[in-house]
Amino acid sequence: MSEKKDVRILAYESSCDETSTAVIKNGREIESLIVATQIKSHQRFGGVVPEVASRHHIEVVSQITKEALNEANCSWKDIDAIAVTYGPGLVGALLIGVSAAKAVSMATGIPLIGVDHIMGHIMAAQLKDEIEYPAIALQVSGGHTEIVLLKDPTHFEIIGDTRDDAAGEAYDKIGRVLGVNYPAGKTIDAWAHQGKDTFNFPRAMLEDDDYDFSFSGLKSAFINTCHHADQIHEKLNKYDLAASFQAAVIDVLAHKTIRAIKEYKPKTFIMGGGVAANQGLRDRMSEEIAKLPKADQPKVILPDLKLCGDNAAMIGAAAYNLYNGGQFADLTLNADPSLELPYAKSMLN
């Protein structure tokens, strides 16, 4: 009996301000991962400038394609599929990755796979450990805050979503008020561990029956508190401000996610997205799950910190599942900045 052939996927990610390529073997093993970051180019603007991001993607995408293949010690004949993020994200940024992947696919004849960016973030967990289904994912980033039910590797259902600002967006906006460079999440998290929750900021929708979120009221309360203090020349403790803000965010995220776990009884709990690197959130979710009855505790997979931000490895991991389900794209694939889950029908049942 012949051994099962290894599947290698060359993946592209360019949905925002990171240009990344990777070679992933069998959906689990990172043979190479290249990330060309643009953070310094955007810091002076306090956030991502779409036109600047697109120009940077153009400058590096060819070079990092070569680097990914070289680092993996691969040639084109070793690659079984080309994967690319085609949404959601910044349309100009997405187009660079999609165009590069389509060009490679057309030139080499290697099949093309379009991957949802959010599916990628969730599947970063697959690079750390095997996911047992059904699973619940808490996806928290600058653009999205969602609770997602995974019925299998390609069938995702959003059961909770943000009504306004995503959690990561709120971090960056309050970071600007505190004079923290973009992206602000890491600094706010560090400050929060040095302060106390003294400001009692609102926990919006905490007791609502659904699993949706709202962070615009928290953001406004934070900004108003700081502006009022400025007007009366009162100096506020930045560590306490950070701790109070983070406590409000984490309370809501943890409360709703644990309630979803109790209702859906998943075999695995996953976190994904940039805010999944937040140590306060990681600790809180692990603690809350440990409080559940032993029989109700799902397996917990928290992705490695380097895989919480945008990267092509997670896209390659997600693409492997689509590859196994025969879900390929053709050369009409286009960027879809408003792409939403669930978009892929399960073919693995």
From Swiss-Prot:
Catalytic activity: L-threonylcarbamoyladenylate + adenosine(37) in tRNA = N(6)-L-threonylcarbamoyladenosine(37) in tRNA + AMP + H(+)
Gene3D superfamilies: 3.30.420.40
Gene Ontology BP annotations: tRNA threonylcarbamoyladenosine modification
One CC-aspect GO term: cytoplasm
Principal cellular location given in the protein's record: cytoplasm
Cofactor annotation: Fe(2+)
CDD domains in the record: ASKHA_NBD_TsaD_bac
Co-factor remark: Binds 1 Fe(2+) ion per subunit.
Name of one Pfam family that matches: TsaD
Keywords, sorted A to Z: Acyltransferase, Cytoplasm, Iron, Metal-binding, Transferase, tRNA processing
EC code(s) of this entry: 2.3.1.234
One GO MF term attached to the UniProt entry: iron ion binding
PANTHER family according to UniProt: TRNA N6-ADENOSINE THREONYLCARBAMOYLTRANSFERASE, TRNA N6-ADENOSINE THREONYLCARBAMOYLTRANSFERASE, MITOCHONDRIAL
Function: Required for the formation of a threonylcarbamoyl group on adenosine at position 37 (t(6)A37) in tRNAs that read codons beginning with adenine. Is involved in the transfer of the threonylcarbamoyl moiety of threonylcarbamoyl-AMP (TC-AMP) to the N6 group of A37, together with TsaE and TsaB. TsaD likely plays a direct catalytic role in this reaction.
HAMAP family named among the record's database cross-references: TsaD
Protein name: tRNA N6-adenosine threonylcarbamoyltransferase
The encoding gene: tsaD
